[in-house]
Amino acid sequence: MADMARLRQVEDAWSAMEAAGIASEVVPVTYMNSSADIKAFCGRNGGAVCTSSNAETALEWAYQQGSKVLFLPDQHLGRNTAVLKMGLSLDDCVVWDPHRPNGGLTTEQLRDAKMILWKGHCSVHGRFSEETIPELRAAIPGVQIIVHPECKHEVVLGADLVGSTEFIIQTVEAAPTGSAWAVGTELNLVKRLAADHPDKRIVFLDKTVCYCSTMNRIDLPHFVWAMESLVEGVVVNQIEVDEETEKWAKVALDRMLALPGKTHKD
C-alpha cells in the first residue's frame, strides 16, 4: 500500500491543487501504512498521520484546519470514515488517480470535493467482496460479519460491524460462547482468533486465501536473528532516513499523538 503513493506523485497532485486554487484549503492526512517521505510531506503541509483506530478523530481535526482533506494512500479507509463517521456523502468524495493526467479529475471536481481520496488500497482487504456476505449468512445462521475499514465501501455497508484491528479482536473476544463470526481482515489474525476461541465459530470472509505478503516478510527465523544480534550489540537491517524527512515526519506523527482519545492503536 505504501508504494502506491510516491512522493513525486503526491507533489504533482499538490501542484494541481495549487493550480486549482484550493491547496490552501486542503489538509493532507496519511494512513500510518505510508512511507516516511509521505509522512514528512503531510508534516510540511499542515497535515497529520492516522491509524484505523483514530481516523475519525484525525479527520475531525483536519476539517477544523481546512475545508478539504487529501487522504492517502488508502482510499477505502478514507471513504468509509468520511461517509460513515463524518456524515459526508459519496458525492463529496473524489478519487485522485496518480496515473492519469490531473488525477483524472477536472478543476471543478477538485474545487467541489470535500474529500480527495488517493487511489490506493490494501491488497488483502481490497479482495473482500460484498457478494460473499449473503452467501455466508445463508450458510451460517446468525453469523455476524465484522470487517476492517480498509475494505471496500460496499463490503462495509453489508457488514454488521466495522472497526480497527483492535476493535475486531476485542469484539470477538467478548462475544458469547456459541456465536458465529465471519471476519474480513488479514487471514493470520482470523486463524489466530479461531485458535484462541474454539468455543466460537470464526471463519474468514473471503472465498480464497490471501496472506499479506508484506507482513509475512517478518518470519520467525529472521525475527530471532534480529533479536539475537541485538543481544550481541549488533544492529542489523537498520532503517535510516535523512534528518529533514525525520523532522517533518515526526511533526505529522506528533500532531496525531496530540489528538484526543485513542490515537495510536491500530
Model-predicted segments: where are they?
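Active-site loop-to-helix "anion-binding N-cap" substructures in soluble metabolic enzymes
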Residues: 1-147, 151-183, 190-266
